[in-house]
UniProtKB/Swiss-Prot annotation:
Protein topology in the membrane: Multi-pass membrane protein
Keyword Membrane carried by entry: yes
Encoding gene (name): OR2M5
Assigned GO CC terms: plasma membrane
GO MF term set: G protein-coupled receptor activity; olfactory receptor activity
Family: Belongs to the G-protein coupled receptor 1 family.
PROSITE patterns from the UniProt entry: G_PROTEIN_RECEP_F1_1, G_PROTEIN_RECEP_F1_2
Classification via CDD domains: 7tmA_OR2T-like (cd15421)
Listed name of the protein: Olfactory receptor 2M5
Main location: membrane
Organism placement in taxonomy: Eukaryota, Metazoa, Chordata, Craniata, Vertebrata
Classification via Gene3D superfamilies: Rhodopsin 7-helix transmembrane proteins
Effect of residue 244 to N: Found in a renal cell carcinoma sample; somatic mutation
Amino acid sequence: MAWENQTFNSDFILLGIFNHSPTHTFLFFLVLAIFSVAFMGNSVMVLLIYLDTQLHTPMYFLLSQLFLMDLMLICSTVPKMAFNYLSGSKSISMAGCATQIFFYVSLLGSECFLLAVMSYDRYIAICHPLRYTNLMRPKICGLMTAFSWILGSMDAIIDAVATFSFSYCGSREIAHFFCDFPSLLILSCNDTSIFEKVLFICCIVMIVFPVAIIIASYARVILAVIHMGSGEGRRKAFTTCSSHLMVVGMYYGAGLFMYIRPTSDRSPMQDKLVSVFYTILTPMLNPLIYSLRNKEVTRALRKVLGKGKCGE
């Protein structure tokens, strides 16, 4: 393999997204602020769901997994970018690059499948409420979540191994702020066209299959909501489902733009901007989308904060 023919001293160079101009310095600290909000928001939501027994339901268990994935996603890219910017070093080892690719791809892939599981959960809750506790019992819910993690990890292993099976004998400057395999393939001195075609097909399958489940689930959900007699029940169902659909739209919209395009149509700046949205903004927005209009979450937060004040 080409991996064996390359030394680990041959680091890659991450060109990053910011220079040291005043404007870019401001944008860098803005990204750090967004990262801090995303880190705190996702951490708080995971802890809140864990601590409050009333949130120990399939829906909130799945949400906790989404927040955990988002938390790991931002931690796999932003800290290295910040370290490189502040230290003036732009290098990343081959092992570090492979690690970033694995975590980044596995977490995105896992979220892809998890969002489909979450839509199925809403379909069962709204269209088959009497069978919900049986169809979404903890064992089944846990298995579906585990499969989401496993499928995402398998995809990441394949992508990472395939990416580093190519030789990189020319420039080692990656036009990105983290290691992403499309940016690496551009640097390869091998013909990567076959791998890119296989990658394209895999991306289509990984996106189309979950999207088909989401569309089918929400088509039934919308029909059920329309025929609901209770105004309160309709409002609650609409609030929950609209939050999920907003996240699905952001996630798959950015994913389609990022990975379905052929390499020849890629612009480094476009990739960077979409990646900032994908890896930083979306993890920040998810806790806000799911919590701002959710009475159960706000109640749990007040309960935890109330206990903290009493403890003081």
